[in-house]
């Protein structure tokens, strides 16, 4: 996409820096004026208010999670600001509508990973609603997260058998009524991993009982990922050099008797990985680190793992977090513009499921922002700042609608070459092939990517 040079500057038209040809050059967060960033955030949210109420189950869960994390960052930075307070009040009523939307669906017709998105969003909704004093709706969202979303994944997606080869257990991304078993992909498993950790922490913080089953499932999901990571011959972790890795879209093992040979729904290609998985896996591992002592105590109490070593456990978690952070820094950020990119695979950008994978860059930034300035020992300030600037400077100047594309053709191709040089894999640079996507869905998802970027940016100020 050619960069648009606007002829008129307004107070909301720049990140307090002059316009440049390549907005990725804006990387110094210290040069930003917080009040200008706040105005941009308010403008971005007002557009989100106009486009968020579309009809697509999983996208609604994810985009509203972006909104809640963004709003939480706004509140922490400017708790007494009248415009921020107005945003928070608007979200109160939006959460009423979102709850009605969720309850209008037959849970048996939804895919397993849908419940992961809604479950995580519901935990953040509880936090927001308790802060605003709506305890009744907060409790409804808690039940939605635990008694419906988590329970659906446990009962209909988790594989309790010991027979799967080469790694048992894990979650299938099938539909909840069992008509389609689906594949054990990364997104379904990491969502259940992260959701189990967060439910356990929520219940523990609020001193509620009956929380051990969530701790147990978090540990089981850890074992599934750790087992795959140790089977280096199957390449579930894409090695980038210098102890940097990225996790693939799904683990595969092509041998007679393998339960991980499925290459459909969506169509798999060699080396394929997705930005969203990287952010969620770093977040899940970080959550696991926060409850490591509880896990160790539970294992000892229940004799659950005779080979468990707490020091090895902790070191392994830290190692994976650091390696993933290095992988993101090396493989998913353009060297020429510092902008966060989607991995260059047709499986991400193509017409089959591009409308789903479109949100990945935002999801990655959402968790980057939550993990702090040095996630895994890597400082992501420059890339978050550059990406937020790029998103802002390629918006529709009239509506403040963000675009699926916020990088130039030239830098896209340079990034694709950068990625192929690192991995020997990937496709040539391409645009998002989402022409068939419902327009309001597209607007809502693209706006949520911007909210994710600005939420992460606020945390850098």
What residue ranges belong to the model's regions?
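Mobile, glycine-rich extracellular loop/lid and propeptide segments
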Residues: 109-122, 142, 148
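Active-site cradle of extracellular carbohydrate-active enzymes
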Residues: 196, 211-288, 325
């Amino acid at each position: 996409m050619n960069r648009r040079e606007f002829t008129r500057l307004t107070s909301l038209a720049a990140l307090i820096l002059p316009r440049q040809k390549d907005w990725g050059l804006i990387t110094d967060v210290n040069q930003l004026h917080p009040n200008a960033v706040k105005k941009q955030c308010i403008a971005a949210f007002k557009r989100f208010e106009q486009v968020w109420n579309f009809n697509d189950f999983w996208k609604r869960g994810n985009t509203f999670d972006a909104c809640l994390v963004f709003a939480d960052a706004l509140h922490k930075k400017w708790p007494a600001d009248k415009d921020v307070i107005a945003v928070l009040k608007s979200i109160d009523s939006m959460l009423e509508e979102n709850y009605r939307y969720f309850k209008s669906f037959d849970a048996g017709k939804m895919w397993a990973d849908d419940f992961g998105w809604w479950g995580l969003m519901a935990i953040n909704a509880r936090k927001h609603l308790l802060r605003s004093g709506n305890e009744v709706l907060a409790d409804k969202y808690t039940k939605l997260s635990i008694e419906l979303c988590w329970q659906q994944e446990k009962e209909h997606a988790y594989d309790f058998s010991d027979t799967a080869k080469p790694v048992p257990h894990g979650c299938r991304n099938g539909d909840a009524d069992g008509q389609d078993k689906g594949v054990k992909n990364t997104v379904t498993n990491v969502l259940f991993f992260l959701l189990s950790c967060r439910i356990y922490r929520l219940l523990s913080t609020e001193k509620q009982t009956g929380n051990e089953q969530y701790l147990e499932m978090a540990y089981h999901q850890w074992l599934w990922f750790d087992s795959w990571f140790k089977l280096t011959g199957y390449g579930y972790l894409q090695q980038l050099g210098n102890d940097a890795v990225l996790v693939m879209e799904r683990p595969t093992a092509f041998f007679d008797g393998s339960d991980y040979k499925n290459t459909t729904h969506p169509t798999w290609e060699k080396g394929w990985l997705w930005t969203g998985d990287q952010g969620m896996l770093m977040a899940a591992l970080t959550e696991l680190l926060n409850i490591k002592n509880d896990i160790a105590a539970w294992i000892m109490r229940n004799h659950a793992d005779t080979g468990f070593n707490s020091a090895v456990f902790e070191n392994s978690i830290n190692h994976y977090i650091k390696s993933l952070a290095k992988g993101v820094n090396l493989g998913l950020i353009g060297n020429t513009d510092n902008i966060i990119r989607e991995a260059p695979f047709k499986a991400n950008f193509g017409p089959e499921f591009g409308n789903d994978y479109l949100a990945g860059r935002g999801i990655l930034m959402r968790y980057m922002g939550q993990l702090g300035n040095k996630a895994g020992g890597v400082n992501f300030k420059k890339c978050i700042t550059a990406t937020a600037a790029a998103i802002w400077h390629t918006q529709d100047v009239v509506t403040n609608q963000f675009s699926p594309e916020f990088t130039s053709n030239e830098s896209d191709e340079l990034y694709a070459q950068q990625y192929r040089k690192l991995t020997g894999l990937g496709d040539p640079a391409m645009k998002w092939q989402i022409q068939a996507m419902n327009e309001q869905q597209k607007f809502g998802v693209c706006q949520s990517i911007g909210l994710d970027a600005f939420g992460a940016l606020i945390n850098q100020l």
